[in-house]
């Protein structure tokens, strides 16, 4: 995938694939990234790419991700001089929808505060708010129940972003309660719903 090759607004949907950019952060739910990407690729007419934080890399193998995978190093390797492309801007132009799954507590706090210190948060800070952005919170129950979490989630919603709520279950740490990322099937169904609402996109 070469995001700089074409501008999404320049080509009708019927002539090209719909571009979904998946952001993945450092929650243990990042273990589900290979399954999530696989299920998204099952939707006809979708092209998928992934932006990862460095901490998220701990939870999956790049060999299990069958699409282009971008990380912080790519931002700086691509840009050498003033005329070179800026990756986070090219990615926000390329993508028709941004799905952040999982969105950990750290990145939630950064985005709510406007901090952009890695490739993913730069994409989110530069995001075109006329395009859908979906986020899937995932964190320990104690972190989820902290009062600041609700404030930060509300802030993202105020930006126009769509929450795919976390669920209650036994977490990897052994605690039981709210904070687990929504199931992959739920996430994929929501992506389909939003694609249809925003573009009239239909599976062939």
Curated annotation (Swiss-Prot):
Cited InterPro entries: Flavin_trans-like, Flavoprotein
Note the effect listed for residue 173 to S.
Loss of activity
Under the heading Gene3D superfamilies, the entry gives: Flavin prenyltransferase-like (3.40.50.1950)
Per UniProt, FMN binds at: 59, 104-107
Kindly state which reaction or reactions the protein catalyses.
N-[(R)-4-phosphopantothenoyl]-L-cysteine + H(+) = (R)-4'-phosphopantetheine + CO2
Which sites bind substrate? 140
Q: Which GO terms describe its biological process?
A: coenzyme A biosynthetic process
Which family, according to UniProt? Belongs to the HFCD (homooligomeric flavin containing Cys decarboxylase) superfamily.
Q: Which PANTHER family match?
A: HOMO-OLIGOMERIC FLAVIN CONTAINING CYS DECARBOXYLASE FAMILY, PHOSPHOPANTOTHENOYLCYSTEINE DECARBOXYLASE
Protein name from the UniProt record: Phosphopantothenoylcysteine decarboxylase
Organism (species): Homo sapiens
């Amino acid at each position: 995938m070469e995001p700089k090759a074409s501008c999404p607004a320049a080509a009708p949907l019927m002539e090209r694939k719909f571009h979904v950019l998946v952001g993945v952060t450092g929650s243990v739910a990042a273990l589900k990234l290979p399954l999530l990407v696989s299920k998204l690729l099952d939707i006809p007419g979708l092209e998928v790419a992934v932006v990862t934080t460095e901490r998220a890399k701990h939870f999956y193998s790049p060999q299990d991700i069958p699409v282009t995978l971008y990380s912080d190093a790519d931002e700086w390797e691509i840009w050498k001089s003033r005329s070179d492309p800026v990756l986070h801007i090219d990615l926000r132009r390329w993508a028709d929808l941004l799905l952040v799954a999982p969105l950990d507590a750290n990145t939630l706090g950064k985005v709510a505060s406007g901090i952009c210190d890695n490739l993913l948060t730069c994409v989110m800070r530069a995001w075109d708010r006329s395009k859908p952005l979906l986020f899937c919170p995932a964190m320990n129950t104690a972190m989820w129940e902290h009062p600041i979490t609700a404030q930060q989630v509300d802030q993202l919603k105020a930006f126009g972003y769509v929450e795919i709520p976390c669920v209650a279950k036994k977490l990897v740490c052994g605690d039981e309660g709210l904070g687990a990322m929504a199931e992959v099937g739920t996430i994929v169904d929501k992506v389909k719903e939003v694609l249809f609402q925003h573009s009239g996109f239909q599976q062939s």
